[in-house]
UniProtKB/Swiss-Prot annotation:
Obligatory cofactor(s): Mn(2+)
Pathway stated in the Swiss-Prot or TrEMBL entry: Carbohydrate biosynthesis; gluconeogenesis
Gene responsible for this protein: pckA
Record InterPro entries: PEP_carboxykinase_ATP (IPR001272), PEP_carboxykinase_C (IPR013035), PEP_carboxykinase_N (IPR008210), PEPCK_ATP_CS (IPR015994)
Binding residues for substrate: 61, 195, 201, 322
Protein name: Phosphoenolpyruvate carboxykinase (ATP)
Keyword Transcription carried by entry: no
C-alpha cells in the first residue's frame, strides 16, 4: 500500500481497520488536491481558479438517513424522539462492509481539529474517497501545523465513501444513503451521498454530544467581536440573516456557523465557512463573493457557463448552492477563532406573519423559551399562488445536529446568560406592515441600525414597552429608525387582522412548546406568549 504525505506513522489509516488499499494520500494541500481531483474527473475549474464540484442526486443533507448507535453509553443521553437509533450490531456490520468496499481504492486523509479552544477540541480524522471532499473538509475545519501532524492522533474518525450503497434490509436503514454515527467510539460512516456538508455536520454532532457534559455550550450560530473586545453571538435558522448580519466590516468575524461557549469565552469549532451562493453578488456580499473568485475555494453545485464563469443566479441544480473556503480568505476574520465572554446574544427570526417587532429585549427565561422554540417562518412557493407563510420551529436553532435533549442545551444557555449578565435580543428580519404578500420586508438598514444600538449598549437606555402578545420588552424610540416600525400593530392598515394574525402565531408557539413543558421550570413556562388585549 503506497502512502504519501506527512502523518504520524504510529497512527496510520490501518488503525481504523482499512487495509489492502491501492494508495493513501495524507494531508495533501490545495494544489495537490486540485491535481488529483482533475486527474480523476471529479470536478471542473472555474475561470477564476475555484474548484467546482457537483454532488449528483443529493444536493443537501439527508436527515432521514442519519442514525445514531444506541448503546449503554448513549441510551440515557441521546434525545431518541429526534435521533433514529441503530443497533451496535448493525453498525459493526456496516463498518465491516465499509472496510471491504474500500479495498483496492485510493483514499485521502485529512488530520484536522474541531474546536479552537485547546481544552475543548477534538482531533477529527476525515477519510474520503473523493479528492475534492478532502479539500472541502480541509477548508472547513481547523488545520494543524506541519509539525503537529507528525504526532497527530485522531480522537474521531469519519469515513466518507459516496460509492458505497447501503442495503436497507441488511443494516435496518431507510435507503442506499446512510450517515451512521457511533458517539461512543467516535466513528462516523457516510455512504451513498456526495453532499460534502454531511462531513462538516458530523463533527458538529459529535461536539454537540461531548461538550455539554463538560459544561460547555455548543451553538449553531455565527459570532463576531467589536473593536473593544465585546463578543456577539447570532442564532438563527437558514434565511434569517445570520451570515449577512454577522459579516460587519467594523467587527472581527470569529465564525459563521458553529461555536462553543465555555469558561474562556466563545470559540469557533471550524476553520472555514460554508456559505450559500444562490443569487450571490459582489454588491450585496463583497467579502463572500471575493472568496468565490480565487484558487482554493470549492464551489458546490454552482453552474458554470461555457467560458467557465460561475452563474450564481442559476439554481437549476439546486437552490442550495454553496462555497467552502478557509476563514483567512475573509479579510477581517479572527486569527485565533476565539472571543471573550459574550456581551450580547441575538436570536434572529424572519417572521413572515408580520406580527413580531424588529427588535425585542429578552429576560434569561424568555431567551431560553425562544431558544427552545427556534422559530422562523418560511415563505411558501409563489408558483402555486400560495401566499400563506409556514411556521418553522427548529429547537436550539439546529435540531438536526443536537443529539441530547433540547432542555440540556437550554438550561446550559440560561445558566451562562445569567452568570455572565449577557443582554439577549430577538431580532425580526421578516415582514412589516402586513404578512408576506401584503407587507414588505423589514428594511435591512433599520435592522442594522437597531443591531448597532444593541451592540454598542445604547439600546439599553431606551424607553421600552411590553409587547401585548409576547410579553417581551420593545423599544419605543431608537435614533435613526422610524418609530412606527417598532410597533408592528401600528404598521398594519387593518388592526383587527393584525390581532387575529398575532393570536394565530401565539397559538403556534404554545402548541409547539407543549413537548418541552415537563422539562422546564415555571419561570420559563411563564415566558410563553399569551394574548393580552391590545389597546386600539
Amino acid at each position: 500500500m503506497k502512502e504519501t504525505g506527512i502523518h504520524n506513522k504510529a497512527a496510520s489509516i490501518s488503525t481504523s481497520g482499512l487495509k489492502e488499499l491501492s494508495a493513501v494520500f495524507y494531508n495533501l494541500g490545495p494544489a495537490r488536491l486540485y491535481e488529483e481531483t482533475i486527474r480523476r474527473g471529479e470536478a471542473e475549474l472555474s475561470a477564476q481558479g475555484a474548484l467546482v464540484a457537483r454532488t449528483g442526486q443529493h444536493t443537501g443533507r439527508s436527515p432521514k438517513d442519519k442514525f445514531v448507535v444506541r448503546d449503554a453509553n448513549t441510551e440515557d443521553h441521546v434525545w431518541w424522539d429526534n435521533n433514529k437509533p441503530m443497533t451496535p450490531e448493525a453498525f459493526e456490520l456496516l463498518y465491516a462492509d465499509f472496510i471491504e468496499h474500500a479495498k483496492g481504492r485510493e483514499l485521502f486523509v485529512q488530520d484536522l481539529i474541531g474546536g479552537a479552544d485547546a481544552d475543548n477540541k477534538i482531533n477529527a480524522r476525515v477519510i474520503t474517497e473523493y479528492a475534492w471532499h478532502s479539500l472541502f473538509i480541509r477548508n472547513l475545519l481547523i488545520r494543524p501545523s506541519q509539525e503537529a501532524l507528525a504526532s497527530y492522533v485522531p480522537e474521531m474518525t469519519i469515513i466518507d465513501l459516496p460509492s458505497f450503497k447501503a442495503d436497507p434490509e441488511r443494516y435496518g436503514v431507510r435507503t442506499e444513503t446512510v450517515i451512521a454515527v457511533d458517539l461512543t467510539r467516535k466513528i462516523v460512516l457516510i455512504g451513498g451521498t456526495s453532499y460534502a456538508g454531511e462531513m462538516k455536520k458530523s463533527v458538529f454532532t459529535a461536539l454537540n454530544y461531548i461538550l455539554p457534559a463538560k459544561g460547555v455550550m455548543p451553538m449553531h450560530c455565527s459570532a463576531n467581536e467589536g473593536p473593544n473586545g465585546d463578543t456577539a453571538v447570532f442564532f438563527g435558522l437558514s434565511g434569517t440573516g445570520k451570515t449577512t448580519l454577522s459579516a460587519d466590516p467594523t467587527r472581527t468575524l470569529i465564525g459563521d456557523d458553529e461555536h462553543g461557549w465555555g469558561e474562556h469565552g466563545v470559540f469557533n469549532f471550524e476553520g472555514g465557512c460554508y456559505a450559500k451562493t444562490i443569487r450571490l453578488s459582489a454588491e450585496a456580499e463583497p467579502e463572500i463573493y471575493a472568496t468565490t473568485q480565487r484558487f482554493g475555494t470549492v464551489l458546490e453545485n454552482v453552474v458554470l457557463d461555457e467560458n467557465r464563469q460561475p452563474d450564481f443566479d442559476d439554481g437549476s441544480l439546486t437552490e442550495n448552492t454553496r462555497c467552502a473556503y478557509p476563514l483567512d480568505f475573509i479579510p477581517n476574520a479572527s486569527k485565533s477563532g476565539k472571543g471573550g465572554q459574550p456581551k450580547n446574544i441575538i436570536m434572529l427570526t424572519a417572521d413572515a406573519f408580520g406580527v413580531m417587532p424588529p427588535i425585542a429585549k429578552l429576560t434569561p427565561a424568555q431567551a431560553m423559551y425562544h431558544f427552545l422554540s427556534g422559530y422562523t417562518a418560511k415563505v411558501a412557493g409563489t408558483e402555486k399562488g400560495v401566499t400563506e407563510p409556514e411556521a418553522t420551529f427548529s429547537t436550539c436553532f439546529g435540531a438536526p445536529f443536537m443529539p441530547r435533549h433540547p432542555s440540556e442545551y437550554g438550561n446550559l444557555l440560561r445558566k451562562l446568560i445569567a452568570e455572565h449578565k449577557v443582554d439577549c435580543w430577538l431580532v425580526n428580519t421578516g415582514w412589516t406592515g402586513g404578512a408576506y404578500g401584503v407587507g414588505k420586508r423589514m428594511p435591512i438598514k433599520a435592522t442594522r441600525a437597531l443591531l448597532a444600538a444593541a451592540l454598542d449598549g445604547s439600546l439599553n437606555n431606551a424607553e421600552f414597552r411590553i409587547d401585548p402578545n409576547f410579553g417581551f420588552a420593545v423599544p419605543v424610540e431608537v435614533p435613526g429608525v422610524e418609530s412606527s416600525i417598532l410597533d408592528p400593530r401600528s404598521t398594519w392598515a387593518d388592526k383587527v387582522a393584525y390581532d387575529a394574525q398575532a393570536k394565530k402565531l401565539v397559538d403556534m408557539f404554545v402548541s409547539n412548546f407543549e413537548k418541552f413543558e415537563s422539562h422546564v421550570d415555571h419561570e420559563v413556562k411563564d415566558a410563553a406568549p399569551a394574548i393580552r388585549m391590545a389597546a386600539e
